Design a protein with these regions (language model features):
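Acyl-CoA/ACP chain-elongation machinery
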Residues: 300-358, 391-405, 437-446, 463-516
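Conserved small-residue
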Residues: 195, 220, 292, 321, ...
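Conserved catalytic cysteine-centered active-site region
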Residues: 41-48, 104, 142-189, 227-291, ...
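Condensing-enzyme catalytic core mediating Claisen C-C bond formation in acyl metabolism
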Residues: 2-15, 22, 332-426, 433-434, ...
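Beta-strand segments within the central parallel beta-sheet cores of soluble alpha/beta enzyme folds
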Residues: 208-220, 274-280, 304-309, 383-392, ...
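Phosphate/pyrophosphate-binding loops at sites that engage ATP/ADP/AMP, CoA/4′-phosphopantetheine
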Residues: 199-214, 268, 377-381, 413-434, ...
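A glycine- and small-residue-enriched flexible loop/hinge segment at structural boundaries
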Residues: 4-17, 30-208, 222-237, 256-274, ...
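Active-site-proximal alpha-helical scaffold in enzymes
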Residues: 190-204, 257, 261, 275-310, ...
Length: 638
């Protein structure tokens, strides 16, 4: 029998805040929360954004005021909320009104017959002196240059970006300050924070977990879709020479797209188990999730950390997407709202999935999911937040433009619906399942994805499957977007509210709606109304994926058929302690008392420390050895 992959921990950070304990989800449905939970969300964000620091039972502001929680919220509540979700890009990343560029120019003398001359530090002279230059030493440090003809130059300039909105991490949050970041690119700083959050919020002791399984039965599958493109990664490597700077030894290696997985193995978990990076544009998270799911179901691995960390809010990436016509520009947003005398649009409504829209809004996020097989979760008493029995991924086939949509998403959605129907029945699929759409907010996406979803839904007999899209709040975090969709969906079963696409006032006329119910408002369905969710992704290049997510109550219902009443009762007894530890972590995080896991140089192993025999490999620090009694899958060929 196949093992059931269950979610036992999740965490990270996006523009809505910390993911664990549904804090980011709660920010999205903030207005529907009771007062005590609103206060918890605001205090957590106050700590994250560094508006206040918890000390001696009070909240200390940057001005030195010591406030109680109620006063802090009354004073800063609106400001805290304004620092989240999609909004105008804050200068802490870069100044959208003054982005540096260089213009190519040819300088020539004002009067005919004259020559250009200037002085420069001798050490700044080019290695290869142009043929039309005459160089004369002025002193030990400076030289005079006389140019015969024109001087080819790059003149520094600035410009204002036409795209000014993004799903930026909460303003004031700086992951580099939380550990010894050593010039790590932003995406890797976010990785350390996000992966730590997922592990610690589970309430599980990681040393206990890893000593329950063999070292090679733990896996990390993670990536981002673009690489670390900021100045501390590939971005610095590509432009440093043109900016008159030096390439460092870290630019290239830390820029690789697989680095989130590498960092988790090397500095967070210390894992020597299976590792892999699948990259597929917007579907990257689901591609890595699929690998984990299939490996757990087959028994190859028992524990998997799936993750992604994308930090694509850079001028270069924004300009790249803009020239494709993919991003929502300010002028287009103003035109959509018929605002002629307004300088800037409402940036908080930049992303409008399935409505009249004009492009997606870029976002940044780091999301991490801790999965186990059902047997291990039951043995440990791990909290089960849901189960993922299947992920489907298919390509588009032949096409003209590589970025154009194709048929692959019809296959992934239809396969996922068929699989889910086999588990929860036709009524469960059509009446008790919601769809977490890709929902980018481009005119093309609203037509093509709605047709995919409508065609599949009606084919299975659905008449009103709820459809929502979290990019309306978070923006498009590229390869990590699937993690945003997954983790915010889990909140529906904690609070019973399906978030609506509130930035979209009405569904566009060209959107296919048969069999679907586009959720434009938050709606309370109840915690157990939905048995499952379908998480969809349509990526550039033909990278399509759809994940099947089972509700926690449905996962437990299924497991009760595999385990005895006594085993389930024992599980709940163990789980009480796990939940208590997780709750203590959440409370400590709100107070800012917990730092990310970052174990640089911790328990580093060398080959001489391994005990290798013909049957097994023993590693220091691991109770269970790696088994070398490997099964031959091709005995019939021997």
């Amino acid at each position: 029998l196949a093992r059931l992959p269950v979610i036992v921990g999740f965490g990270g950070i996006n523009s809505a805040g910390r993911t664990s304990f549904h804090q980011a989800y709660r920010r999205i449905i903030f207005d529907l929360l009771p007062n005590d939970l609103q206060q918890e969300v605001l205090l957590d964000l106050a700590n994250i954004t560094q508006i206040a620091e918890f000390q001696n039972g009070l909240w200390l502001t940057a001005d030195g005021e010591a406030l109680d929680a109620e006063t802090l919220i009354d004073t800063f509540g609106e400001e805290i909320l304004a620092r989240t979700l999609i909004r105008r890009i804050h200068p802490s990343l870069f100044d959208v009104d003054n982005v540096v560029l260089h213009k190519s120019s040819a300088l020539s003398p004002v009067s005919e017959g004259e020559k250009l001359s200037f002085s420069v530090k001798t050490r700044s002279l080019p290695d290869n002196i142009p043929a039309n230059w005459q160089v004369k030493a002025l002193s030990n440090t400076h030289s005079e240059i006389t140019v015969d003809g024109t001087l080819e130059t790059f003149i520094k300039d600035t410009k204002s970006l036409s795209v000014k909105a993004a799903g930026q991490l909460p303003t004031g949050f700086d992951p580099a300050k939380l550990y010894q970041s050593r010039n790590h690119p932003r995406g890797l700083q976010m990785t350390v924070y996000g992966a730590s959050d997922a592990i610690l919020s589970s309430g599980l002791d990681w040393d206990v977990v890893r000593n329950q399984v063999a070292p090679d039965q733990i896996a990390v599958y993670a990536a981002n879709s673009i690489g670390q493109m900021d100045d501390l990664g590939f971005g610095g490597m590509l432009k440093s020479a043109l900016m008159g700077k030096r390439t460092t030894s870290k630019h290239l290696p830390l820029g690789y797209a697989q680095m989130p997985a590498d960092f988790v193995n090397a500095y967070v978990l210390g894992s020597v188990g299976n590792v892999g990076t699948s990259i597929g544009a917007c579907a990257t998270y689901f591609f890595n999730l699929e690998r984990a799911i299939e490996s757990i179901k087959s028994g190859k691995i028992r524990v998997a950390m799936v993750g992604g960390s994308d930090a694509p809010i850079t001028p270069e990436i924004i300009e790249g997407f803009r020239t494709m016509g993919a991003l929502a520009e300010d002028t287009a947003l103003l035109a959509l709202d018929l605002l002629e005398n307004q300088k800037e649009p409402d940036h908080t409504r930049s992303c409008r999935p399935f409505a009249q829209n004009c492009g997606f809004t870029i976002g940044e996020s780091s999301q991490w999911t801790l999965l186990m097989d059902d047997e291990l979760a039951i043995d440990l008493g791990a909290t089960i937040y849901g189960a993922i029995p299947a992920v489907y991924a298919f390509a588009d086939g032949y096409k003209k433009s590589i970025s154009a949509p194709g048929v692959g998403n019809y296959l992934t959605v239809s396969k996922a619906m068929a699989y889910l129907q086999n588990i929860i029945g036709k009524e469960g699929l059509t009446k008790h399942t919601f769809i977490q759409a890709h929902g980018t907010s481009t005119p093309q996406n609203r037509v093509t994805e709605s047709h995919v979803l409508s065609k599949a839904a009606t084919s299975f007999g659905a008449d009103a499957m709820p459809v929502t899209a979290m990019k309306a709040y978070l923006g498009h975090s590229q390869g990590t977007a699937g993690g945003d969709q997954l983790h915010l969906s889990l909140g529906v079963w904690e609070h019973g509210v399906l978030p609506g696409i509130v930035t979209s006032s009405e569904v566009a006329d060209d959107v296919y709606q048969a069999g679907l119910k586009f959720q434009l408002k938050h709606e309370e369905y109840g915690k157990t109304h939905f048995d499952a969710a379908l998480l969809n992704s349509k990526g550039f290049g033909g990278n399509n994926a759809t994940a099947v997510l089972l509700a926690p109550h449905k996962a437990i219902e299924l497991l009760k058929k595999r385990y005895s009443e006594e085993q389930i009762e024992e599980y709940y007894e163990k789980n009480a302690a796990i939940k208590s530890a997780a709750t203590a972590y959440n409370e400590a995080m709100i107070r800012g008392e917990i730092k990310p896991i970052y174990r640089f140089g911790f328990n580093v192993l060398g080959g001489e420390e391994l005990d290798i025999s013909e049957q097994q490999i023993k590693l220091p620090g691991y109770e269970i050895p790696v088994d070398l009694n490997v099964t031959n899958d091709f005995e019939d060929l021997i």
